[in-house]
């Protein structure tokens, strides 16, 4: 789905240590981080906050290893390993907070996801669901996306393989995230910023 998901960190070295510690535990070395990008905050980019990012795993044991590696390294748990039937009958996940308090999850769906993508899904907090819906409705065609599954507090955006959710359930709005998508053939160029400060392009 994503060409890149770029998180801007207040302390780049600290964020690299967090993601290396946790992703190493599920067998993903930095040269295989794929669509995940980290960059330092500065004059041209503010810190990413309020993001939930979930990573694909191949087993419940890998989910446990992700969480244990983070906790043993001193990172804060955001949810112990376990089943989450509220999401799906075979959903098994564990959650940690990165150095900027973004929520990072390892998830196993009871079956392997198809394809090489590292990121399973994102939850992006929004301050105004109606405004965010209008934003994504306008961008859906040139990004090759579909909106679906609307509920009072959230809706989902997907392509053929993956999805992400825009959520207005009282959580902090996601700020200063950068998303790049592959452009469908013949699509117009997109460079836009959502109402809460996430930048979106199909030039990735």
Give the predicted meaning of each segment.
Residues 5-86:
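Ordered, small/hydrophobic-rich secondary-structure cores
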Residues 74, 110-111, 123-126, 144:
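Short, well-ordered alpha-helical segments in soluble proteins
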Residues 20, 67, 98, 137, ...:
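Short glycine-/small-residue-rich flexible loop motifs, especially phosphate/cofactor-binding loops
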Residues 6-41, 125-164:
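Core segments of cupin and vicinal oxygen chelate
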Residues 113-114, 147-149, 170:
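Short, conserved, surface-exposed binding loops centered on an aromatic residue
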Residues 43-47, 102, 161-166, 172-173, ...:
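Short, charged/polar, Gly/Pro-enriched secondary-structure boundary elements
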Residues 2-10, 46-69, 71-127, 155-156, 186-204, ...:
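Vicinal oxygen chelate
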């Amino acid at each position: 789905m994503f060409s890149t998901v770029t998180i801007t960190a207040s302390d780049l070295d600290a964020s690299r240590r967090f993601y290396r510690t946790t992703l190493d535990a599920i067998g993903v070395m930095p040269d295989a981080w794929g669509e995940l990008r980290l960059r330092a905050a500065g004059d041209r980019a503010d810190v990413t906050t309020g993001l939930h990012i979930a990573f694909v795993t191949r087993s419940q044991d890998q989910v446990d290893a992700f969480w244990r590696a983070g906790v043993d390294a001193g990172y804060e748990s955001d949810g112990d390993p376990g089943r989450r039937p509220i999401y799906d009958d075979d959903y098994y996940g564990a959650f940690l907070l990165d150095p900027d308090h973004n929520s990072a999850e390892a998830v196993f769906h009871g079956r392997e996801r198809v394809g090489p993508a590292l990121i399973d899904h994102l939850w992006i907090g929004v301050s105004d669901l109606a405004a965010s819906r209008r934003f994504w409705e306008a961008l859906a065609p040139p990004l090759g996306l579909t909106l679906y599954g609307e509920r009072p507090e959230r809706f989902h955006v997907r392509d053929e393989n993956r999805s992400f959710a825009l959520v207005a359930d009282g959580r902090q709005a996601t700020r200063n995230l950068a998303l790049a998508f592959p452009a469908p053939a013949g699509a117009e160029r997109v460079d836009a910023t959502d109402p809460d400060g996430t930048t979106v392009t199909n030039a990735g």
